[in-house]
Every structure is written in C-alpha cells, then in structure tokens.
C-alpha cells in the first residue's frame, strides 16, 4: 500500500468486536523498543505523511470494500460504485442487489452490499443526511463508539477510517500487522483484538500512528513475509524476538 492509497482492512470485521479505541492499559509501556523500531522502519521505508483529511463516509465505504481483496481491486470497486451512484443518497435508493452487482469484482459482493445499504439507511435515519463529517470534531473514543454501532463495522474498519479520514491517532491492526507485532514482541503471541488495540494505542508515540501503520505494511510485504521472512536484511531484527532465533 502506498502512503497515498486508501488503507485496507483485509480481514473481515467482526461486528460484535469492541470499539477500536479503548482505555489504555494501567501500566505505562516502555517506549524504547517501539521508538527504535519506528525510527529504523522510517530509515528503511521513508516517513509517510497523512497530510489532509478526507470524507469519513467515503473512507468508511472504501474500507468495507477493501476487505478480503487487493488494494487495486478495492479502488476499482469503489470507483465503479461512485460512478454508478454519484451520491450516497442515490446508493441508498438503489436495490441491494444493484449495489452488489456494481461491486461484484471486489469479492463478497452480497455481504458488502448488505453492510453498505444498512449503514447508509441507519445514518440517514439518525442524522437526516448522509454525512459523517462531524466525526472530524469528535474525541477519538466518542467517534469510535459511534461507528461501532453499525452492523459489520469492526475495530479494524473503525481504526482505518479514523486514522486515514480524520487523522485521528489510533492504530489499525490486521493479520499482517498482527504477525509483525507478535514477531517483534510488542504484543503477546496469544492476544485478542481488544487487548492488542489497548496495547498499541497506548504504546505508539504521538505523531507516529500513521507512519508506523504504513511502514509495517510495507515491511510485511518487503521482508517480514508470512513465510521465509528475510530476517538477515531486516532493519529491526535487533529488537525482534522471532528474528533473533533465526540469525
């Protein structure tokens, strides 16, 4: 994923999961290892910047469409959806089957169409307009609680929406980021989504949420792959529990 492309939440969200932003753990974390890791990832991959806010509802739908597909497919699917329905009110008036047919190329079309249709309907009923720009002004925990009420919207989708659209300092986790964080020892091997979000939202230094998220994705694709990771070339192997067992 490039720094300018929409984020992906490649895992299917669990609508019963807790909000993405929760109270921090009681014990203050040791920031030294994570600061080292962030610094060395930035030396290796650059310092990505999230320079501007974007429309939260657009972003939320993009994240829904990104689940279980590639960045390229999700962008293509979102573009097709916006071309077919220039406004979200037009999408709301459409049949769910028409939405599904429009996003078919992105996979899980029926499931995603149901989530999108339900989301739009509920926002319209509650707010009177299909507009989530008010999320820009809400405290992070309040924005997270609001988004968590929608069916099919879980912690990864919430965190990605708030980080990328609102520039909120919250840390999204997916399978790939979970893998790297477990390897370097920042989260336990057995760790729930809720606990992992607690740990990382408390641990990541202010101003580094976006950079760390994007660079972990880059690192996972370039070196820290699920199989045959290139530990000998890893810029953070010194602090990696897993890597130290292989070199």
Predicted regions span which residues?
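Catalytic cores of DNA base-excision repair glycosylases
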Residues: 21-247
């Amino acid at each position: 994923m490039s720094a300018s492309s929409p984020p992906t939440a490649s895992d299917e969200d669990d609508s019963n999961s807790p909000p993405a932003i929760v109270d921090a753990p009681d014990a203050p974390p040791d920031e030294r290892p994570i600061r080292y890791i962030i610094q060395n990832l930035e030396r290796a991959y650059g310092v990505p910047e999230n320079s501007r806010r974007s429309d939260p509802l657009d972003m939320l739908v993009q994240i829904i469409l990104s689940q279980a597909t590639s960045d390229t497919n999700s962008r293509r699917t979102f573009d097709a959806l916006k071309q077919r329905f220039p406004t979200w009110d037009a999408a709301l008036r459409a049949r769910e089957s028409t939405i599904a047919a429009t996003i078919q190329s992105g996979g899980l079309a029926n499931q995603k169409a149901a989530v999108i249709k339900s989301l739009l309907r509920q926002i319209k009923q509650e707010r009177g307009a299909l507009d989530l720009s008010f999320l820009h002004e809400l405290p992070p925990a309040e924005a997270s609680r609001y988004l968590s009420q929608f069916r099919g919207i879980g912690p990864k989708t919430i965190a990605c929406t708030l980080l990328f659209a609102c520039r909120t300092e919250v840390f999204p986790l997916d399978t790939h980021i979970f893998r790297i964080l477990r390897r370097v020892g920042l989260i336990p091997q057995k760790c729930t989504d809720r606990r992992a979000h607690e740990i990382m939202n408390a641990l990541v230094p202010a101003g580094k949420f976006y950079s760390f998220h994007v660079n972990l994705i880059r690192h996972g694709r370039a070196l820290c792959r699920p199989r045959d990771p290139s530990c000998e070339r890893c810029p953070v192997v010194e602090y990696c529990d897993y890597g130290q067992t292989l070199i």
